[in-house]
A protein has these predicted regions:
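Structural recognition of the conserved hydrophobic beta-strand(s) that form the central parallel beta-sheet
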Residues: 3, 34-41, 210-213
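Conserved interdomain linker/interface between the two RecA-like ATPase lobes of SF2 helicase motors
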Residues: 37-144
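Conserved C-terminal RecA-like helicase domain
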Residues: 1, 102-210, 225, 233-241, ...
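C-terminal accessory/interaction regions of large nucleic acid-associated machines
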Residues: 235, 303-546
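A short beta-strand element within the Helicase C-terminal
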Residues: 2, 210-233, 260-263
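Conserved segment of the helicase C-terminal RecA-like domain
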Residues: 33, 238-281
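SF2 helicase catalytic motif II
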Residues: 1-32
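Long, hydrophobic alpha-helical segments
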Residues: 267-326
Length: 546
């Protein structure tokens, strides 16, 4: 049985939709006897999932159903931020009337006073700029510090994981953790997965009072709230809106009438009514089969390889790419790179890696792309390679975040000046350049720093470093570069039997060369889990764990 949850992702107008359908088709090819289940909320034509991937022709017994169920009802409000008044309005003007009626209370304040929780849906940029903390200060001030030992333990776990300090405002200070101590949660797609799981558990345990969240929460696990406030309304994303509304209210076993509250801006009222009534349908044509996508040519090659069966599941690359990565232009660079990456004692230390190493990695990536890198792509790529080298040396996520923060915010120099009694000079030091995460390849990418040049070192947001580091590790290194460089070095090892190439290939892909740890990683265990589980493992391979 293979379950594809949130299967509406196949319709996303981004490479995510492309990758989703490619996984479906590869699974159909290799697991033809398996039962495939697709689950998507609010979709009127679930049969489109069968049509776009040819499942109806493969299996004529395939069935589908559309369940129109609602777990709990909602009351709708609009909030006039100028007058600070709330108004009731009907989701269906034909049935409930077109007029809004003033509410004589604040539903957010009321929920918080009763010990309830509030989800506020905002743009990620407003979280990064801290605008949300000013905009919703009235409600934040109602949230007092939490003294529950279970909650404090979870906060301390998160603090240790990201490597933050909460005692020194000048170094490694996490504003996110300070807010969390008062039950204020921040949840978005650049939050490390481990951190997200802690925060979701924190919320489920009832410790969350206010949650500022982006669209990542749409497909999150069960995290209901008493009030959902849509500070951001995206009319084009009807499924997103309906998913978020669905988080308002929870059904309980208590003898009370269960319902949730949904709040919008006045200018979103009519658009919301339209979205609320709109039927959601999937396209019956896969993005793999469209020909007018405006995407990088590498993705066009990927689409063609999936459709023609010219895709290697061993390396997660097209056969065309694999041939390219065995060319003389690649194999002449690899031994030079291995010489620089290894010393007699093993891997060279990260701080002794020569700039030629970055140039050689760039050269290999250039051969893969079949073109020169733009200046902006080079900055992003070099940052990714530096982080990858740190990982190869066993640096934890927290240590990598601390290293990047120390560099960009001039920690060493600021501390020296501060200890010398020159606090004003320490406070006036500005940041050093560091490239922020961006998806590459992207020929249109512009060069920009993670922090503007005039930013003071003492004002560098440690949380922003955490989010950016995770984006590099998850979206670029883990999702793209690891497969590419694993293929380069593993193929070189097979051709020339250079053990260093095999070691480097394993470290690039898995972060270890230990075969037991590699198998455990492939089974889905994290390094944190492997640390205590490994002694319990007698044997492990592709068939079983003993």
């Amino acid at each position: 049985l293979i379950l594809f949850d949130e299967a509406q992702l196949s319709d996303e107008q981004s490479v995510r939709g492309l990758y989703f359908d490619s996984i479906v088709r590869r699974a159909l090819k290799y697991f033809s006897d398996a039962k495939f289940v697709f689950a998507h909320p609010f979709i009127e034509n679930p049969e489109a999932q069968l049509q776009k991937n040819g499942i109806e022709t493969i299996d004529t017994t395939a069935t589908y159903s559309n369940y129109e169920l609602k777990n709990v009802g909602q009351i709708f409000y609009t909030h006039d931020s100028t007058s600070q008044k709330f108004y009731h309005f009907g989701s269906d003007s034909a049935t409930l009337g077109k007029r809004k009626l003033e509410a004589n209370f604040d539903p957010i304040e009321s929920a918080l006073k009763k010990g309830g929780s509030v989800l506020i849906y905002v743009p990620k940029s407003h979280i990064y700029s801290k605008q949300v903390y000013i905009q919703f200060q009235k409600y934040i001030s109602m949230c007092q510090p939490i003294d529950n030992p279970i909650a404090i333990k979870m906060i301390d776990e998160l603090k240790e994981y990201i490597g933050a300090s909460t005692t020194d405002k000048s170094f490694y200070n996490s504003d996110m953790l300070e807010k969390l101590r008062c039950g204020i949660v921040v949840h978005h797609g650049s939050m490390p997965l481990t951190a997200r799981l802690i925060l979701e558990h924190f919320t489920q345990q009832g410790f969350c009072k206010i949650c500022f969240a982006t669209s990542t929460l749409e497909q999150g696990i069960n995290m209901p709230f008493d009030v959902v406030y849509l500070d951001r309304f995206e009319e084009s994303k009807t499924l997103s809106v309906k998913n978020l509304i669905g988080r308002a209210g929870r059904s309980t076993n208590k003898p009370v009438f269960d319902f949730g509250s949904v709040i919008l801006r006045p200018n979103a009222m009519s658009r919301f009514r339209k979205v609320y009534r709109e039927k959601n349908t999937l396209s019956s044509k896969s993005r793999l089969d469209t020909t007018d996508d405006k995407i990088d040519e590498k993705y066009e090659e990927y689409k063609e390889a999936i459709k023609t069966g010219e895709f290697s599941d061993e390396y997660n690359l097209t056969n065309k790419d694999l041939e390219k990565l065995k060319s003389d232009n690649v194999t002449t660079v690899v031994p030079t790179l291995l010489d620089m990456m290894f010393s007699d004692a093993g891997f060279v230390l990260p701080n002794t890696v020569a700039k030629e190493v970055y140039e050689d990695f760039q050269c290999l990536y250039k051969q893969y792309l079949g073109r020169e890198l733009t200046a902006a792509e080079k900055f992003v790529f070099d940052s990714a390679i530096k982080i990858r080298i740190w990982k190869m040396h066993g640096k934890t996520f927290s240590k990598i975040c601390q290293e990047r923060y120390a560099y960009v915010s001039n920690v060493a120099q600021r501390r020296l000046l501060s200890q010398a009694g020159q606090q004003d000079r320490a406070d006036s030091l500005t940041v050093r350049y560091i490239a922020g995460y961006n998806d590459i390849p992207d020929k249109e990418l512009r060069t920009y720093p993670l922090f503007p040049a005039e930013t003071k070192g003492k004002d560098v947001d440690y949380d922003r470093i955490v989010y950016d580091t995770y984006d590099f590790l998850d979206k670029l290194i883990g999702f793209k570069l690891s497969d590419l460089f694993y293929a380069i070095f593993h193929q070189y090892y097979l051709a020339y039997q250079d053990d260093r190439a095999e070691r480097l290939a394993k470290y690039i892909k898995y972060g270890t060369e230990d075969s037991t740890e590699i198998w455990m990683l492939r089974y889905g265990f994290s390094f944190e889990e492997i640390e205590w589980l490994k002694p319990c493992v007698e044997s492990i391979d592709q068939t079983e764990i003993k």
